[in-house]
From Swiss-Prot:
Keyword hit for Nucleus: no
Official protein name in the record: Exu regulon transcriptional regulator
UniProtKB keywords: DNA-binding, Repressor, Transcription, Transcription regulation
Source species, domain of life: Bacteria
Role: Repressor for the exu regulon that encode genes involved in hexuronate utilization. It regulates the ExuT, UxaCA and UxuRAB operons. Binds D-tagaturonate and D-fructuronate as inducers.
SUPFAM superfamilies to which the protein is assigned, alphabetical: GntR ligand-binding domain-like, Winged helix' DNA-binding domain
DNA-binding region(s) from the entry: 35-54
Amino acid sequence: MEITEPRRLYQQLAADLKERIEQGVYLVGDKLPAERFIADEKNVSRTVVREAIIMLEVEGYVEVRKGSGIHVVSNQPRHQQAADNNMEFANYGPFELLQARQLIESNIAEFAATQVTKQDIMKLMAIQEQARGEQCFRDSEWDLQFHIQVALATQNSALAAIVEKMWTQRSHNPYWKKLHEHIDSRTVDNWCDDHDQILKALIRKDPHAAKLAMWQHLENTKIMLFNETSDDFEFNADRYLFAENPVVHLDTATSGSK
């Protein structure tokens, strides 16, 4: 069965894999095919497969073992995930959520460059100064504060509320937490340099550069998360995780075209 519905593909793929497991196509103790083969068979991206496998792992059907692959450990769900209607951003796949942030926050940064004040710039510079003193960059409060302050620089508090909610609700997202279990605790996600590029564009009040810098920052985050978990899932990352129809074409950045 080839999956053609473009909406929430990883959920459809997870349902198909669960059906195969429950019907005995894959038995307890078996390994699922490598992700690249599932992606080719279903004609979907590897990030869709990654999110589907994470969903199966959260529900207790499979266990992803470092250097060994994806093992079937149960033919029935061990853990049921109930959607929390009060946490609308806590129920999405991690790469789906990052893609949404990339689309929204790159446009927020573009608009912020047209509205930013001297006070906004001073606050962003102070945040960066504090962030430089961090011992560990991952899950830093200063990372969150920078993104919120960029949104506040639009002079639209509703945009800042959206950014904050998308960020903070990750801690309630079982798929986001499961993905991070596969990341080495020693991994450093050095986002400070990316933030510097965003800040420089805002100082220049350059909307296009601000949009590109925010887009690239979240692209770097997606690539880091994908690459850092790939050893466990046994395949290499694509260069661009959501390459279809990108809002910003990074290859054209040097020419300044949109």
